[in-house]
Swiss-Prot record:
InterPro entries: GTP-CH-I_C/QueF (IPR043133), GTP-CH-I_N (IPR043134), GTP_CycHdrlase_I (IPR001474), GTP_CycHdrlase_I_CS (IPR018234), GTP_CycHdrlase_I_dom (IPR020602). It is an enzyme of class 3 (hydrolase). This is GTP cyclohydrolase 1. Keywords: GTP-binding, Hydrolase, Metal-binding, Nucleotide-binding, One-carbon metabolism, Zinc. It comes from Desulforamulus reducens (strain ATCC BAA-1160 / DSM 100696 / MI-1) (Desulfotomaculum reducens). It catalyses: GTP + H2O = 7,8-dihydroneopterin 3'-triphosphate + formate + H(+).
Length: 187
Protein backbone atom coordinates (compact mmCIF):
# COMPACT_ATOMS: atom_id res chain seq x y z
CA UNK A 1 0.00 0.00 0.00
CA UNK A 2 2.79 2.44 0.84
CA UNK A 3 4.99 3.62 -2.02
CA UNK A 4 8.22 4.00 -0.03
CA UNK A 5 10.38 5.11 -3.01
CA UNK A 6 7.87 7.85 -3.80
CA UNK A 7 7.91 9.07 -0.18
CA UNK A 8 11.74 9.04 -0.21
CA UNK A 9 11.77 11.09 -3.40
CA UNK A 10 9.31 13.60 -1.92
CA UNK A 11 11.36 13.99 1.28
CA UNK A 12 14.51 14.51 -0.76
CA UNK A 13 12.70 17.22 -2.75
CA UNK A 14 11.57 18.93 0.46
CA UNK A 15 15.13 18.94 1.80
CA UNK A 16 16.35 20.48 -1.46
CA UNK A 17 13.49 23.02 -1.44
CA UNK A 18 14.49 24.33 2.01
CA UNK A 19 18.10 24.69 0.90
CA UNK A 20 19.57 21.53 2.43
CA UNK A 21 21.85 19.04 0.74
CA UNK A 22 20.05 15.68 1.02
CA UNK A 23 23.33 13.91 0.26
CA UNK A 24 25.28 15.36 3.18
CA UNK A 25 26.20 13.21 6.16
CA UNK A 26 23.32 13.13 8.60
CA UNK A 27 20.70 13.62 5.89
CA UNK A 28 21.59 11.02 3.29
CA UNK A 29 19.49 8.30 4.97
CA UNK A 30 16.75 10.67 6.13
CA UNK A 31 14.40 10.12 3.16
CA UNK A 32 14.41 6.35 3.76
CA UNK A 33 13.95 6.82 7.52
CA UNK A 34 11.01 9.18 6.98
CA UNK A 35 9.40 6.74 4.53
CA UNK A 36 9.64 3.90 7.07
CA UNK A 37 8.35 6.21 9.80
CA UNK A 38 5.30 7.15 7.70
CA UNK A 39 4.65 3.48 7.04
CA UNK A 40 4.59 2.91 10.81
CA UNK A 41 2.67 5.97 11.99
CA UNK A 42 0.08 5.73 9.20
CA UNK A 43 -0.44 1.98 9.68
CA UNK A 44 -4.09 2.64 10.53
CA UNK A 45 -4.74 3.38 6.85
CA UNK A 46 -4.27 -0.31 6.08
CA UNK A 47 -6.79 -1.62 8.60
CA UNK A 48 -10.44 -1.44 9.54
CA UNK A 49 -10.27 -0.44 13.22
CA UNK A 50 -13.84 -1.68 13.79
CA UNK A 51 -12.59 -5.25 13.35
CA UNK A 52 -10.97 -5.00 16.78
CA UNK A 53 -14.49 -5.05 18.22
CA UNK A 54 -15.41 -8.26 16.41
CA UNK A 55 -14.93 -10.53 19.41
CA UNK A 56 -17.27 -9.92 22.32
CA UNK A 57 -18.08 -11.68 25.56
CA UNK A 58 -21.38 -12.34 27.24
CA UNK A 59 -21.25 -10.88 30.72
CA UNK A 60 -24.16 -9.89 32.94
CA UNK A 61 -23.05 -6.27 33.16
CA UNK A 62 -25.20 -3.37 32.05
CA UNK A 63 -23.40 -0.60 33.92
CA UNK A 64 -20.72 1.80 32.72
CA UNK A 65 -17.42 0.46 31.45
CA UNK A 66 -14.78 3.19 31.27
CA UNK A 67 -11.25 2.94 29.91
CA UNK A 68 -9.36 6.14 30.65
CA UNK A 69 -6.07 7.59 29.51
CA UNK A 70 -5.61 5.59 26.31
CA UNK A 71 -2.45 7.26 25.00
CA UNK A 72 -2.60 8.25 21.35
CA UNK A 73 -0.68 10.07 18.71
CA UNK A 74 -1.89 11.09 15.32
CA UNK A 75 -0.91 13.42 12.51
CA UNK A 76 -2.89 16.57 11.88
CA UNK A 77 -4.00 16.23 8.28
CA UNK A 78 -3.66 19.98 7.71
CA UNK A 79 0.06 20.25 8.53
CA UNK A 80 1.29 16.64 8.90
CA UNK A 81 2.51 17.52 12.37
CA UNK A 82 1.63 15.28 15.34
CA UNK A 83 -1.04 15.74 17.92
CA UNK A 84 -0.49 13.76 21.09
CA UNK A 85 -2.92 13.02 23.86
CA UNK A 86 -5.29 10.52 25.36
CA UNK A 87 -8.75 9.14 24.81
CA UNK A 88 -11.33 8.17 27.41
CA UNK A 89 -14.00 5.69 26.33
CA UNK A 90 -17.19 4.91 28.25
CA UNK A 91 -20.03 2.63 27.22
CA UNK A 92 -22.95 0.79 28.79
CA UNK A 93 -23.20 -2.75 27.40
CA UNK A 94 -26.58 -3.92 26.16
CA UNK A 95 -27.63 -7.52 26.86
CA UNK A 96 -24.25 -8.17 28.49
CA UNK A 97 -22.37 -7.68 25.20
CA UNK A 98 -18.87 -6.53 26.30
CA UNK A 99 -15.57 -6.34 24.48
CA UNK A 100 -12.04 -6.82 25.78
CA UNK A 101 -10.62 -3.64 27.27
CA UNK A 102 -7.54 -3.80 25.06
CA UNK A 103 -9.83 -3.85 22.02
CA UNK A 104 -10.95 -0.32 22.87
CA UNK A 105 -7.32 0.85 22.93
CA UNK A 106 -6.70 -0.91 19.60
CA UNK A 107 -9.77 0.81 18.14
CA UNK A 108 -8.50 4.23 19.27
CA UNK A 109 -5.05 3.61 17.83
CA UNK A 110 -6.40 2.22 14.57
CA UNK A 111 -8.22 5.46 13.90
CA UNK A 112 -5.41 7.65 15.27
CA UNK A 113 -2.68 6.15 13.06
CA UNK A 114 -3.63 8.04 9.91
CA UNK A 115 -3.84 11.66 8.78
CA UNK A 116 -6.61 12.84 11.05
CA UNK A 117 -8.63 15.59 12.69
CA UNK A 118 -9.28 15.27 16.40
CA UNK A 119 -12.97 15.99 15.91
CA UNK A 120 -13.30 13.18 13.35
CA UNK A 121 -11.22 10.78 15.46
CA UNK A 122 -13.54 11.28 18.44
CA UNK A 123 -16.64 10.71 16.30
CA UNK A 124 -15.19 7.62 14.56
CA UNK A 125 -14.42 5.93 17.87
CA UNK A 126 -17.92 6.55 19.25
CA UNK A 127 -19.67 5.53 16.03
CA UNK A 128 -17.66 2.30 15.73
CA UNK A 129 -18.57 1.27 19.29
CA UNK A 130 -22.25 2.03 18.67
CA UNK A 131 -22.22 0.06 15.43
CA UNK A 132 -20.27 -3.00 16.55
CA UNK A 133 -21.32 -3.38 20.20
CA UNK A 134 -24.83 -1.87 20.09
CA UNK A 135 -24.52 -0.53 23.66
CA UNK A 136 -27.10 1.61 25.43
CA UNK A 137 -24.75 4.54 24.99
CA UNK A 138 -21.20 5.75 24.43
CA UNK A 139 -19.14 8.75 25.55
CA UNK A 140 -15.72 9.39 24.03
CA UNK A 141 -13.51 12.27 25.16
CA UNK A 142 -10.19 13.01 23.47
CA UNK A 143 -7.67 15.50 24.91
CA UNK A 144 -4.61 16.38 22.85
CA UNK A 145 -1.86 18.90 22.31
CA UNK A 146 -1.54 19.82 18.65
CA UNK A 147 2.06 20.54 17.72
CA UNK A 148 0.79 22.60 14.77
CA UNK A 149 -0.38 25.06 17.45
CA UNK A 150 2.67 24.60 19.68
CA UNK A 151 5.44 24.88 17.08
CA UNK A 152 4.03 27.24 14.47
CA UNK A 153 1.39 29.89 13.96
CA UNK A 154 0.11 30.98 17.37
CA UNK A 155 2.97 29.10 19.13
CA UNK A 156 1.00 28.13 22.19
CA UNK A 157 2.79 25.12 23.71
CA UNK A 158 0.75 23.17 26.22
CA UNK A 159 -2.66 24.24 24.91
CA UNK A 160 -4.95 21.22 24.89
CA UNK A 161 -7.95 20.62 22.69
CA UNK A 162 -10.80 18.58 24.19
CA UNK A 163 -13.44 16.95 21.99
CA UNK A 164 -16.33 14.70 22.90
CA UNK A 165 -18.82 12.45 21.17
CA UNK A 166 -21.97 11.39 23.01
CA UNK A 167 -24.31 8.68 21.75
CA UNK A 168 -27.41 6.78 22.89
CA UNK A 169 -28.63 7.09 26.48
CA UNK A 170 -25.86 9.57 27.32
CA UNK A 171 -27.26 11.96 24.73
CA UNK A 172 -30.82 11.60 26.03
CA UNK A 173 -30.23 11.39 29.78
CA UNK A 174 -28.47 14.38 31.31
CA UNK A 175 -27.81 12.63 34.66
CA UNK A 176 -26.13 9.65 32.96
CA UNK A 177 -24.04 11.96 30.80
CA UNK A 178 -22.98 14.02 33.85
CA UNK A 179 -22.02 10.87 35.77
CA UNK A 180 -19.95 9.56 32.85
CA UNK A 181 -18.21 12.89 32.31
CA UNK A 182 -17.40 13.28 36.01
CA UNK A 183 -15.87 9.79 36.12
CA UNK A 184 -13.92 10.41 32.92
CA UNK A 185 -12.53 13.76 34.05
CA UNK A 186 -11.72 12.61 37.60
CA UNK A 187 -7.96 12.10 37.97
Amino acid sequence: MFDLPKIEKAVKMILEAIGEDPNREGLEETPARVARMYQEIFAGLGEDPEEHLGKTFSEEHEEMVIVKDIRLFSMCEHHLIPFIGKAHVCYIPRNGNVTGLSKLARLVNGYARRPQLQERLTKQIADAIMKRLNPYGVVVVVEAEHLCMSMRGVRSPGARTVTSAVRGIFKKNEASRAEAMSLIMKS
